[in-house]
Regions:
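Asparagine-centered polar/low-complexity signal
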Residues: 77-80, 106, 234
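Anion-binding (especially nucleotide phosphate/pyrophosphate-binding) glycine-rich loop
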Residues: 85-100, 108
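Active-site glycine-centered loops adjacent to acidic/histidine catalytic or metal-binding residues
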Residues: 107, 134, 241
Length: 248
């Protein structure tokens, strides 16, 4: 079975039909740049461009970088325009897509669902935390395979700031940090804080940096939990968005 998944990020909006039997993209994904400002109408236009690229006419799952309740309503919008707050994203996107059924969920939760079913978390019990490092830091918390939604651990305080302002991939790029310095001094400190709070058995590191895991994972220090890269890499959000549609 195929369902369409769209992943809205701080820098790009990407999507593709997903083969839910294999947990992989059925076609090469299509990406457009996230508009700035990333207002609801502008982002909805971007989602429509991605869906229209494939001529898709069925249900669509969409991820969003913030807290999402009831599969529809946006409650926070850290890396997009504040106009999203309290927006019914399901209604907005459904209207923009000509009435197609739409389901919306947090972006990291979507990636986590995909990794737990098809990727690095498959078959794992206990406490598992997926963290996506990109424009910000997203999180998905699982206890014995069950998702605790909308944890948003990128907004924990670290050195007096939101953690994602200290340890995201964007921070590494903006400050021209080496992979080693970023891992040893920023990511390690952040993971230690999360580990103190939740004592997970496993950290899964996702987002775009998962493709470069060999450059930074060996330099993460002082963490008791196992740390592995996401297997679905940066397609996990698209796959998880499609999976959520199939659950409803």
């Amino acid at each position: 079975m195929q369902i369409f998944g769209v992943d809205i990020g701080g820098s790009g909006i990407k999507g593709a039909p997903v083969d839910l039997d294999k947990g992989d993209l059925a076609q090469e994904r299509h990406k457009v740049l996230t508009p700035h400002p990333a207002t609801p109408d502008a982002v909805a236009d971007g989602v429509k461009q991605v869906v229209d690229h494939f001529g898709w006419s069925g249900p669509v799952g969409v991820t969003f970088p913030g807290v999402v309740t009831d599969g529809a309503t946006i409650r926070t919008a850290a890396n997009v325009d504040d106009g999203w707050i309290d927006t019914d994203a399901r209604a907005l996107l459904g209207e923009r897509l000509g009435g197609l059924p739409v389901t919306v969920l947090n972006d990291a939760d979507a990636a986590g669902v995909a990794e737990m079913h098809f990727g690095a978390g498959r078959g794992r019990t206990g406490t598992v935390i997926l963290l996506t490092f990109g424009t910000g830091i997203g999180s998905a918390l699982f206890v014995d395979g069950v998702l605790v939604p909308n944890t948003e651990l990128g907004h924990l305080e670290l050195d007096g700031h939101d953690a994602e302002k200290r340890a995201s991939s964007k921070v590494r790029e903006d400050h021209d940090m080496t992979w080693e310095h970023w891992a040893a001094h920023r990511v390690s400190k952040y993971l230690a804080h999360v580990e103190m709070l939740f004592s997970p058995e496993l950290f899964i590191i996702g987002g775009g940096v998962s493709r470069k895991a060999h450059k930074f994972l060996p330099h993460i220090e002082g963490i008791k939990a196992e740390i592995v890269p996401a297997q679905l890499q940066n397609n996990a959000g698209i796959v998880g968005a499609a999976m959520r549609v199939a659950e409803h």
